[in-house]
Amino acid sequence: LSPSSAASDVYKRQAPLALTYKAINTMDSMLGYKNERYLYFGRVPAKLDDVANYIPSRLAGLLWVAAAAFTHNDAKGAWKIWRRDRRRHASPNSAQTESACAGALGVQLAGPAYYFGEYYAKPTIGDPLRPIEPEDILRANRMMYVASAFALAWGVAIRTVL
């Protein structure tokens, strides 16, 4: 096999998986609501999305802890809050990166919210060591970029070995 045909074979195997993942993710976004209209029909894509993102979300949480150290944020705080609060959400995957970010920044995130005009009491994530400020958006973005670079490097390394 030539290098180009070998690469083509890899893409042919991966494309259906990527499309399946995207379909699951989109169905969850559109139908995975816990309201009367979608409660039963939306449960399947919501659970499939939980399964599909179980490992990636945890790896992403760890990458955010590492990114905190490289962006001069509080890596120890990120680790502590990630370990403590990563399960403080109705979805098993949603608080993984959010908790690491909250710990790295020393802020409290989440909490009560309104959806479709209805109040929902939700747990907070992180400790309110200081008030949230606009600069935190830039700090979180930097951590996101560094965590993404780590994930890309990790993927390239795995792909090179395999």
PLM regions and their residue ranges:
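C-terminal binding/interaction regions
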Residues: A140
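Active-site His/Glu-centered metal-binding helix of metallohydrolases
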Residues: A23, M27, L31
